[in-house]
């Protein structure tokens, strides 16, 4: 368990990093500080309400105004019929005073009731148009926000991303745009309705009796002040809450999910869960403050409504006595203002959504309005030469610091000249500034001083888009997009004449690039050839195949400049040799700058530049530098491999060695070949698994579908600790809900007394005075219950969202690796579920739950109250309620269909945004910014187009439910007059029923207005239920299994007849009858082509997967017999691509510790760092071990990240050390030191090393050569050389020339 003090320390460090950064900037020269600030600064944007509509076209403005007009008509219609009510009450007065006969009374009431029917028709039409136009435009405008935000973010300079959390962009583009969509859709309509209703009520009241209207209006000022103050505080705390989650919580989740293999290998789930929970606690703290603000605001509005009406009725009775008003006018004023204030009060919950929308828009607008200091998307900024670049590059006296690390000088007075058409190699230690040179040439960053020119022209004066289109750029870690191979390579043609050429011409160019990059042969073996989809981040291809596709993409445009940042580092030896030949050929006539650790790849460079700490310490050709016997000679000696005595070996076909998950797709799949091992201590019995289905989730026993009951159990189960808050809040909401029916009784008695003849005015005044005190009492009750309802239920809701997010996070950390291989479970999609869908559960809890309970009580209470006062009128009025409910239910069903389609599209668009922004360097180097936005736009627009019919259906059923209210009123008055004519009802009883039914009908409408929230919550609950109830096949939570005593663990490993296929690709054999033995303390190496099964072997030892047949044994026991956590505690893994987490360097190293953190001393941490050759570097940093690593270690170089990862493995003191290309990212000097440390650390431990650099495994006890999932050779280095076979050829291909 992680110590809370350390977690709090980390949180404090992250919170103050901006302040610390500013302090470091202030210590620099003002000019340098300004250059660095310009790359980082984002100005705070104050977003007004009207800026929510900043992306409206003239048509959008017209439709929005039209929609708001219909919303206003809809809102004003309800108070309008109070004029009819007043006329009817005067008719009642005349009837009770015998001025009207029965038939005449009936005829007059029937005539007046028809006006309610007309008003209902008007409300139905206006409600339909309002709902359809607002929801449709809301979806359109939110889509535009999504597109503009992605467009703005993807064009920002790279320093902007150095401060950005890994999951922040995807969270913003899903969560925040969804908040904007809610704010400008039906919630805005509800606000306009409320305002229009109140204004109409006020106008009618003043026109009827201005003195009484003035008294009622006195509450408006108080309400406005209350709402304004409440909204201000809500916005403040909501902004804090959203910012905390997006910047910290989403980043923790995204990093954990993206690096899930590292996370589970080191058992880091508890640490990350604590880290995540701390962020969620801070989110709850700010959300609670926002909820309290809402509670106070609503309580004041409720109470003021009752108190003002007590005064109004008292004053109204006085006006009647004085003869300045009749009962009809008094009823008009009271009823109009009652309905108007009711609508005004209902604005408050909707204001919360407006505040959230404004808060979200202000955050998005910061990025949208930010003008990047380096803009690669602009086509008109800077000089655009009319011809291609020649390729002469020169850097003079360049000084450089990274904006996020201003206290570290990276380049100091650096100068380099690269003649056109020449090849220059940059070598040196990690962190010496090699990759920085590439970043400056690509204009990812700005130099502080000095000159950088291309063909004599300052690159800062050139158009950045044009500049990048002159460069072919291949990074150390190949980045492919989840599209076809053809599309991935075609992105290299952006900006060329061929980009929009005939497809045949374009395809020929792409195919030639594939051939030049040695990729065409393996592409032809794929089932769909060049149209094969490479999968998320290219996971369906091996590392070498991905790199060759990336190289083809870089050279397809025939650029004049090639920047190769470790371009062949991911290739196996055989592939590297052939691809290097292709690159050497491609470099002819081009300016090529190569950053290299493998010195065998740059022997033929025209100039080799040796760098150290940002300076050139040596330069010359390979032979010249060898003869000087300086730093370069030492690097060469460190990489030299003992060569085979004879090179007379048959040349092997590279494709025979290079196997990827897709290479065997043409092979017919026989389900009988796939079997699952029954868990026995010995033997290899197999059982037949069910046939693989596309929708199944690999590695997971899929749960049953969720139902209303399961959703309820889910919510209650995760919220049961807050049952006290829920109980108190529910009781308060029930009491609050009955306040309106109680007011119907009070109003009925009051208005009944007001139709009394003048001779009984004394009785009227007495009744009014008593009822006034009841109003005051009910107002006090509503104040307390409204605050308690919002405060208690919102707190429970905030805790529920926290619990769901934490439970989801822990469950995701529990899932086995096969789960994450599934196409639907990308890091972007899962981060979206954590951010958005967990939040949507509020639709079944919190303020929404309180409003629903309150509305139900008001509806039922209105019926229960009305019927006893006059069952004849009450039953008829109540009979219409089921019709309204049916309309509401149908609307919910339509919304369900709409939400299902929208969720699928927005999850996909969220994953797309996450993919593009996480590969921003690749996107910008390819000048894909506009192309990315176009593709994203198509995805978003497809949802908007497909959802319009569903939106129209939803609007129709909503309109029907709204139009029913005046029709119910017409029915009540028609039937009521009939009953009164018969002498079976009094005015007081009739008015009580009327008021109870009116408020009840409105309550039913309120229930339906929450249908979108309830529907979204239901969909979210279904997805959450799917994950939370899934049980992984390899369960890290299981406490079952053998736990070996520490002293008895040896570290023997054995593979017996192991067959394996990945669950998501069961037709592709990966390991076939693999037999391999590793004894305690042995150092064995696995070599071979990319995709031949080496890393899969590592994964099976870690038990990321189980074999389909055969056994993997640890100390003689099948891995499946062990307790999983206990097993992994004896194993440490260092992967090819180092994955670090946001936090300090100390925390990242401590991730490897498997025991209590309290047992770890600083000396132990430093010792692990020294062994990994990283301690001195850490101590050179101003903050030492407390230095923040940045998102995914973005503030460190590749070699530095890898050494932190090695230190993380060594502090674990494992019995088994798994090294999957552990030194591939290190320079030769560091590699030699680290390899010596690893060799020392391997003593007494079982070590399995996957290696392409054969120099690192010469001393291995046994070397296994893999091909096609089988072992084709085994032995030590010397014996394999003597065989003069597969291994000998790999050695000869990798050796450097003789000195």
Curated annotation (Swiss-Prot):
Membrane topology category: Multi-pass membrane protein
Extracellular topology ranges: 86-114, 209-214, 315-326, 747-769, 870-874, 976-987
Pfam families: ABC_membrane, ABC_tran
InterPro entries in UniProt: AAA+_ATPase, ABC1_TM_dom, ABC1_TM_sf, ABC_transporter-like_ATP-bd, ABC_transporter-like_CS, P-loop_NTPase, Type_1_exporter
Keyword set includes Cell membrane: yes
Gene3D superfamilies cross-referenced by the UniProt entry: ABC transporter type 1, transmembrane domain (1.20.1560.10), P-loop containing nucleotide triphosphate hydrolases (3.40.50.300)
Chief location bin: membrane
Family statement drawn from the similarity comment of this UniProt entry: Belongs to the ABC transporter superfamily. ABCB family. Multidrug resistance exporter (TC 3.A.1.201) subfamily.
Biased segments, Polar residues type: 681-690
PROSITE patterns per record: ABC_TM1F, ABC_TRANSPORTER_1, ABC_TRANSPORTER_2
CDD domains given in the database record: ABC_6TM_Pgp_ABCB1_D1_like, ABC_6TM_Pgp_ABCB1_D2_like, ABC_MTABC3_MDL1_MDL2
Any one biological process term the GO annotation gives: oligopeptide export from mitochondrion
Location in the cell: Cell membrane
Stretches for region Disordered: 681-703
PANTHER family membership: ATP-BINDING CASSETTE TRANSPORTER, ATP-DEPENDENT PERMEASE MDL1, MITOCHONDRIAL
Residues in the Cytoplasmic compartment per record: 1-64, 136-187, 236-293, 348-725, 791-848, 896-954, 1009-1299
Name assigned to this protein: Sophorolipid transporter
GO CC field: mitochondrial inner membrane; plasma membrane
Highest taxon in the source lineage: Eukaryota
Residues spanning the membrane: 65-85, 115-135, 188-208, 215-235, 294-314, 327-347, 726-746, 770-790, 849-869, 875-895, 955-975, 988-1008
Statement: the UniProt record of this protein carries the keyword Cell membrane: yes
Keywords: ATP-binding, Cell membrane, Membrane, Nucleotide-binding, Repeat, Translocase, Transmembrane, Transmembrane helix, Transport
Induction field: Induced in early stationary phase (at protein level).
Any GO MF annotation of the entry: ATP binding
């Amino acid at each position: 368990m992680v110590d809370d003090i350390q977690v709090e320390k980390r949180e404090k460090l992250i919170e103050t990093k901006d302040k610390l950064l500013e302090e470091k900037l202030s210590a620099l020269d003002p000019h340098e500080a300004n250059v660095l600030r310009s790359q980082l600064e984002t100005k705070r944007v104050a977003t007004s309400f009207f800026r929510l509509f900043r992306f409206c076209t003239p048509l959008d403005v017209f439709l929005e105004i039209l929609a708001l007009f219909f919303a206003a008509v809809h809102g004003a219609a309800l108070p309008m019929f109070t004029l009819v009510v007043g006329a009817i009450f005067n008719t009642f007065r005349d009837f009770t005073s015998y001025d009207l006969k029965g038939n005449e009374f009936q005829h007059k009431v029937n005539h007046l009731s028809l006006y309610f029917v007309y008003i209902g028709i008007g409300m139905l039409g206006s409600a339909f148009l309002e709902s359809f136009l607002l929801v449709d435009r809301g979806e359109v405008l939110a889509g535009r926000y999504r597109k503009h935000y992605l467009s703005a973010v993807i064009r920002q300079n790279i320093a902007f991303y150095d401060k950005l959390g890994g999951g922040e962009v995807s969270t913003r583009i899903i969560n925040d745009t969804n908040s904007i969509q809610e704010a400008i859709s039906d919630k805005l309509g509800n606000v306009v309705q409320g305002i229009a209703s109140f204004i109409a009520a006020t106008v009618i009241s003043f026109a009827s009796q201005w003195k009484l209207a003035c008294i009622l209006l006195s509450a408006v000022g108080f309400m406005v002040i209350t709402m304004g103050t409440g909204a201000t505080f809500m916005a403040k705390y909501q902004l804090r809450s959203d910012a905390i989650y997006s910047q910290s919580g989403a980043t923790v989740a995204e990093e954990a999910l993206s690096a899930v293999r590292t996370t589970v290998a080191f058992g880091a789930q508890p640490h990350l869960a604590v880290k995540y929970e701390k962020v969620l606690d801070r989110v709850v703290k700010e959300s609670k403050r926002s909820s309290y603000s809402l509670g106070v605001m609503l309580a004041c509005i409720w109470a003021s409504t009752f108190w003002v009406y007590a005064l109004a009725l008292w004053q109204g009775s006085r006006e009647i006595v004085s003869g300045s008003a009749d009962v009809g006018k008094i009823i008009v004023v009271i009823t109009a203002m009652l309905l108007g204030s009711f609508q005004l009060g209902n604005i408050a919950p909707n204001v919360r959504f407006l505040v959230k929308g404004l808060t979200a828009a202000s955050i998005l607008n910061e990025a949208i309005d930010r003008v990047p200091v380096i803009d690669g998307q602009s086509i008109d900024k800077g000089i655009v030469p009319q011809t291609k670049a020649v390729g002469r590059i020169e850097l003079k006296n360049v000084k450089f610091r990274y904006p996020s690390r201003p206290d570290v000088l990276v380049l100091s007075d650096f100068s380099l000249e690269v003649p056109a058409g020449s090849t220059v190699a940059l070598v040196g230690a990690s962190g010496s500034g090699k990759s920085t040179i590439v970043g400056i040439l690509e204009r990812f960053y700005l130099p502080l001083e000095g000159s950088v020119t291309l063909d004599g022209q300052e690159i800062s004066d050139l158009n950045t888009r044009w500049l990048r289109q002159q460069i072919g750029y291949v990074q150390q870690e190949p980045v492919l997009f989840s599209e076809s191979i053809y599309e991935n390579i075609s992105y290299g043609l952006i900006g060329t004449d061929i980009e929009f050429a005939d497809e045949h011409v374009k395809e020929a160019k792409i195919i030639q690039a594939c051939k030049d990059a040695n990729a065409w042969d393996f592409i032809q073996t794929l089932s769909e050839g060049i149209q094969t989809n490479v999968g998320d981040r290219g996971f369906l291809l091996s590392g070498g195949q991905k790199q060759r596709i990336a190289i083809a993409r870089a050279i397809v445009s025939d650029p004049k400049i090639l920047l190769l940042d470790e371009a062949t580092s991911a290739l196996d030896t055989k592939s590297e040799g052939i691809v290097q030949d292709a690159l050497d050929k491609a470099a002819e006539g081009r300016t090529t700058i190569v950053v290299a650790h493998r010195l065998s790849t740059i022997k033929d460079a025209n100039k080799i530049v040796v760098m150290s700490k940002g300076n050139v310490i040596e330069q010359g050709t390979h032979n010249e530098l060898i003869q000087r016997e300086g730093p370069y000679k030492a690097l060469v000696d460190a990489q030299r491999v003992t060569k085979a005595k004879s090179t007379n070996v048959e040349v092997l076909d590279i494709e025979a060695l290079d196997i990827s998950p897709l290479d065997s797709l043409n092979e017919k799949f026989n389900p009988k070949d796939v079997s699952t091992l029954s868990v026995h201590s010995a033997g290899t019995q197999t059982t037949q698994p069910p046939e693989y289905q596309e929708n199944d989730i690999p590695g997971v026993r899929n749960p049953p579908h969720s139902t209303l009951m399961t959703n309820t159990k889910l919510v209650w189960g995760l919220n049961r600790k807050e049952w006290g808050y829920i109980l108190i809040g529910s009781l308060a909401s029930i009491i609050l809900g009955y306040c309106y029916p109680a007011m119907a009784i009070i109003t009925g008695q009051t208005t009944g007394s007001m139709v009394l003849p003048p001779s009984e005015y004394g009785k009227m005044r007495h009744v009014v005075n008593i009822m006034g005190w009841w109003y005051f009492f009910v107002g006090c009750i509503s104040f307390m219950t409204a605050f308690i309802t919002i405060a208690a239920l919102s707190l429970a809701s905030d805790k529920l969202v926290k619990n769901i997010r934490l439970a989801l996070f822990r469950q995701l950390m529990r899932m086995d690796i096969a789960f994450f291989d599934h196409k639907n479970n990308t890091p972007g999609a899962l981060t979206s579920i954590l951010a958005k869908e967990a939040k949507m559960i509020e639709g079944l809890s919190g303020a929404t739950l309180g409003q629903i309970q309150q509305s139900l009580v008001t509806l039922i209470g209105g019926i229960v109250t009305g019927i006893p006062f006059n069952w004849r009128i009450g039953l008829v009025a109540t009979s219409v309620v089921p019709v309204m409910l049916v309309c509401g239910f149908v609307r919910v069903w339509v919304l369900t269909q709409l939400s299902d389609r929208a969720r699928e599209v927005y999850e996909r668009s969220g994953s797309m945004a996450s993919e593009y922004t996480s590969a921003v360097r690749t996107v910008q180097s390819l000048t894909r910014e506009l192309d990315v936005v176009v593709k994203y736009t198509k995805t978003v627009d497809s949802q908007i187009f497909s959802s319009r019919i569903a939106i129209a259906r939803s609007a129709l059923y909503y309109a029907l439910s709204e139009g029913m209210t005046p029709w119910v009123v017409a029915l009540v008055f028609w039937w009521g007059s009939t009953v009164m004519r018969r002498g079976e009802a009094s005015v007081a009883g009739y008015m009580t029923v009327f008021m109870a039914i009116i408020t009840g009908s409105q309550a039913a409408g309120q229930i339906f207005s929450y249908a979108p929230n309830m529907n979204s919550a239901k969909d979210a609950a279904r997805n959450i239920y799917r994950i939370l109830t899934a049980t992984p096949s390899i369960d890290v939570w299981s406490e079952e299994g053998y736990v070996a005593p520490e002293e008895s663990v040896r570290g023997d490993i054995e593979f017996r007849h192991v067959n394996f296929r990945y669950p998501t690709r069961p037709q592709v054999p990966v390991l076939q009858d693999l037999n391999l033995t590793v004894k305690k303390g042995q150092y064995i190496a696995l070599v071979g082509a990319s995709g031949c099964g080496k890393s899969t072997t590592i994964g099976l030892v870690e038990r990321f997967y189980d074999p389909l047949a055969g056994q993997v044994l640890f100390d003689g026991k099948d891995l499946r017999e062990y307790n999983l956590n206990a097993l992994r505690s004896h194993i440490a893994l260092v992967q090819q691509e180092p994955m670090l987490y946001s936090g300090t360097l100390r925390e990242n190293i401590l991730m490897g510790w498997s025991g209590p953190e309290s047992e770890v001393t600083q000396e132990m941490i430093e010792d692990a760092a020294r062994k990994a050759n990283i301690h001195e570097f850490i101590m050179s940093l101003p903050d030492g071990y407390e230095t923040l690593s940045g998102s995914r270690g973005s503030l460190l170089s590749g070699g530095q990240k890898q050494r932190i990862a090695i230190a993380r493995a060594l502090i674990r003191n494992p019995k088994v050390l798994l090294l999957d290309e552990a030194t591939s990212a290190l320079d030769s000097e560091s590699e030699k030191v680290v390899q010596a440390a690893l060799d020392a650390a391997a003593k007494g431990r079982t070590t399995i090393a996957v290696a392409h650099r054969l120099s690192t495994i010469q001393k291995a006890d046994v070397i296994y050569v893999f091909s096609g999932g089988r072992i084709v050779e085994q032995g030590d280095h010397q014996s394999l050389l003597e065989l003069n076979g597969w291994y000998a050829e790999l050695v000869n291909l990798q050796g450097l020339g003789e000195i």
